[in-house]
């Protein structure tokens, strides 16, 4: 992001649009409403005594972060061992590990979630929800609720945790997911209006992964210059006017700030095998011109990292891989959330004889690794 800011200083009309093939739009929109920030909350299940999950596969790809370690710590046998209630429509890894798994249609899951919220706030509830409400009240701050699906479900789960004063909520923010559907739609409007002169696609392929990929392909055709930074000959590669082979991540330098207080560096394990370059190297070349000493991305990375790692030396940070407690800031706190609107939306889902649940298979992801034979051996 620092590099793109420098790039934008050179080219003021440049815009950065983040695209996720598997978006967490509902979760991010809910976080924006409840916490006032578009970042996912970080939870810690260590020491918790009750977790109630509504469609949330929190041992899978839920919330953009992993809870397996703290879940395992809380599940050690003992008087305060974590009790796990899973309410879901399809079988998940998380549901398979639950003490009590309640199988319901999606519309029914929504209604139980609303009733649990109402019950915790003094409202009347059904017999099924009453038992969950009672357990949550007994455990209080040692309980936590997760939900997945719509924005409304996430909002109610956050507000339930606020009501419980759940200790699982750390106040830390997870920055790994950034896709903004509104921003993406704005970008599509720019292309449709002929306002995009150059499009640089950094190893993304919306033509394949987006539900309206064919429409995206037609819009791309309106852009005079399309550059695909790609690792394979995919649909975006075919639509581009120019292609830059991107370096494999095992050949690349980089840094990340995955969550509050954590800064991490990545370094290549091998020299580049082919004539390729990572997007950061390309941005430096486009900023400074060819054969410029300032195009060395390692030097750029080192200079920027030094400002983020506090008193740690760059070599020490590189050796450890992770620097905790650095200058990566951003904390979350409860600042809002419209429970009435969320409840109305969830109750509006009409029950029917057949209801559809769509989910992302963790092992397949967005399908970009479908040419890996191992991924063709999965039972489903």
Can you say where each PLM-predicted feature lies in the sequence?
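General structural feature for long, well-ordered alpha-helical segments within catalytic domains
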Residues: 3, 7, 44, 67, ...
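Short hydrophobic/aromatic-enriched beta-strand-loop microsegments
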Residues: 13-16, 102-105, 166-170, 243-248
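A cross-kingdom feature strongest in bacterial/archaeal respiratory oxidoreductases
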Residues: 5, 14-21, 40, 53-93, ...
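Non-catalytic, well-ordered alpha-helical segments in soluble enzyme domains
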Residues: 278-306
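Anionic-ligand anchoring segments at beta-strand to alpha-helix junctions in alpha/beta enzyme folds, i.e.
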Residues: 2-40, 155-183
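Long, well-ordered, tryptophan-enriched scaffold segments
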Residues: 44-143, 147-149, 159, 163, ...
